[in-house]
């Protein structure tokens, strides 16, 4: 099977809520078992060819689209879902910008910064973490932004499900990126 650069399919529930990134093979299985409700995207991501049906003299062909919604109930309750945090997703949420000086930096020059320091019970959560450059993080030290006289230039927030799928930063096809971006909440930093 020939794999293209963009080899993952965005799996949705029937309402169009992102559920997972799945492989071409996994997506083809959904197509073959008729569990796909609808598809989207600018044409197939891949066309997979199988064996020949002797009775009909035809080869089996499965078109796998980059976005596919499956029949059945959603496995994800949106109100229970808090996206997993990673350093890179945090930096992308904050647009690689220090929350204290407002400068943009390369990933290697950024740190995850606890607004409320860990020593004071500050947790590793979306609402307590911001992106900081090494200099500002060192200057703020083990203090709150108020104590350090370093007010936050932007507020932390929990990314929506659509934002989270963009923040994962896979090599997303342009049509899939646009589909997700068109569903971002109003005021999203990612739009």
Regions flagged by a language model, labelled:
Residues 1-82, 87, 150-191:
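Short helix-coil boundary/hinge micro-motifs
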Residues 82-110, 130-136:
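Short cysteine-rich loop/turn motifs with clustered Cys
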Residues 103-131, 140-156:
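Histidine-centered nuclease catalytic patch
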């Amino acid at each position: 099977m020939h794999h293209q650069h963009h080899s993952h399919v965005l799996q949705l529930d029937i309402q169009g809520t992102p559920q997972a990134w799945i492989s071409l093979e996994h997506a083809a299985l959904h197509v073959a078992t008729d569990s796909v409700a609808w598809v989207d995207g600018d044409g197939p991501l891949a066309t997979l060819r199988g064996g020949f049906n002797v009775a009909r003299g035809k080869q089996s062909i499965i078109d796998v689209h980059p976005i596919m919604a499956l029949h059945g109930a959603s496995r994800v309750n949106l109100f229970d879902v808090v996206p997993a945090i990673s350093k890179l997703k945090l930096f992308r949420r904050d647009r690689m910008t220090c929350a204290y000086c407002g400068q943009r930096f390369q990933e290697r020059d950024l740190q995850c910064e606890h607004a409320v320091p860990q020593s004071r019970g500050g947790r590793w959560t979306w609402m307590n973490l911001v992106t900081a450059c090494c200099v500002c993080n060192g200057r703020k030290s083990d203090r709150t932004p108020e104590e350090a006289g370093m007010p936050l230039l932007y507020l932390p927030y929990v990314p929506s499900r659509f934002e989270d799928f963009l923040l994962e930063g896979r090599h997303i096809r342009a049509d899939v990126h646009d589909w997700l971006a068109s569903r971002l909440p109003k005021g999203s930093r990612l739009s």
